[in-house]
Swiss-Prot record:
It is a multi-pass membrane protein. The gene is rnfA. Part of a membrane-bound complex that couples electron transfer with translocation of ions across the membrane. This is Ion-translocating oxidoreductase complex subunit A. Coiled coil: none annotated. It comes from the Bacteria. It is found in: Cell inner membrane.
Amino acid sequence: MLLLWQSRIMPGSEANIYITMTEYLLLLIGTVLVNNFVLVKFLGLCPFMGVSKKLETAIGMGLATTFVLTLASVCAYLVESYVLRPLGIEYLRTMSFILVIAVVVQFTEMVVHKTSPTLYRLLGIFLPLITTNCAVLGVALLNINENHNFIQSIIYGFGAAVGFSLVLILFASMRERIHVADVPAPFKGASIAMITAGLMSLAFMGFTGLVKL
């Protein structure tokens, strides 16, 4: 109703721009909060559990994943649109996307190693493991399945990365507080971490219906 009202009071071109920008904003919000890739789609759980013990490491991992996810989404879209479809080799999509992600991760690893050796050491094995992070491959494949255009692919990849980073940083903050709390012995370690992740997932259920994609 709001979009219809706006389209009536605005000139045609301005109304179209407004509607398009609104759709992009809703796509971003929906990807970050409503359809969070970790808590709703259960993708990227390995780094979510493995790199969330320290807040500093979680922030670094979130930044690296944001860069990789966004760039990989763009590269995957270009490969799909200008290589796989024109040549009729869509059956090589998964393998091609894995190669694209591996190249992007290698580039990211080189950048982090040069710019922040301390962060590179803190991330350790988890930085190259972004290659096998199912969230990165999942975003690339879902972009194709949803028939997103170039801009939508960028927004979808960026939104997925922001959603991943958000829950990773929140989870790391809570785990640091839990680490110094008086937790009963049977719940220490992975047990309390899984319970905390479950409570976070329930909290994010409150965003259900906020955006209908």
